[in-house]
């Protein structure tokens, strides 16, 4: 009798443990505000020397972007950069960078140059020590013309230290024309 009572208590405890399992939505899955504007702010010696902007007020699909600046940099120069994310609604722009930085462990920015001689190194990390990319150092070498694909990837629970730019799903993707001269 004692043995069957103990076994019954174990089964009840195990079943109760399963039935109390929570199915809440984790904080890391929280939606951030829509991003339909981005500013890349370039500094030399701490002073802002240029800001390049892309805006697509109606978001993906619909109308084409209303603005994509050409990134123009000098050869043989090192820049520090900062990303400013914006949500544009009815002509009003609201900075939403903190919405993404507060969820840094689930996001990563990618800078993918083509046809231009620039080395881009992310200088900030998330709480797990993985690259984020809101801040970066850009070092140009020789003159040239090409493009820079700028991407923000959302990767809840899958972000790693050296992820491929296609891992996760895209929150933002802009192809900036670029010139080093």
Pin down the residues of each PLM region.
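Bacterial N-terminal signal peptides that target proteins for export
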Residues: 1-8
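Bacterial Sec-dependent N-terminal signal peptides
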Residues: 4, 15-40
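First exposed extracellular module after export/assembly in secreted or surface-exposed proteins
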Residues: 28-181
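Hydrophobic helical h-region of N-terminal Sec-dependent signal peptides
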Residues: 10-14
């Amino acid at each position: 009798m004692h043995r069957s009572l103990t076994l019954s208590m174990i089964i009840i405890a195990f079943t109760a443990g399963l039935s109390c399992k929570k199915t809440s939505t984790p904080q890391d899955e929280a939606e951030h505000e829509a991003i339909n504007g981005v500013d890349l702010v370039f500094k030399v010696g701490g002073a802002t020397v240029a800001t390049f902007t892309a805006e697509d007020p109606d978001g993906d699909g619909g109308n084409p972007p209303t603005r994509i600046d050409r990134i123009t940099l000098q050869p043989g120069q090192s820049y520090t950069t900062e990303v400013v994310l914006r949500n544009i609604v009815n002509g009003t722009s609201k900075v939403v960078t903190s919405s993404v930085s507060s969820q840094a462990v689930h996001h990563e920015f990618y800078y993918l140059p083509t046809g231009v001689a620039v080395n881009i190194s992310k200088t900030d990390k998330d709480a797990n020590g993985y690259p984020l990319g809101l801040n970066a150092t850009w070092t140009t070498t020789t003159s040239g013309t090409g493009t820079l694909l700028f991407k923000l990837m959302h990767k809840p629970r899958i972000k790693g230290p050296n992820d491929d730019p296609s891992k996760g799903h895209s929150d933002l993707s802009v192809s900036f024309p670029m010139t080093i001269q």
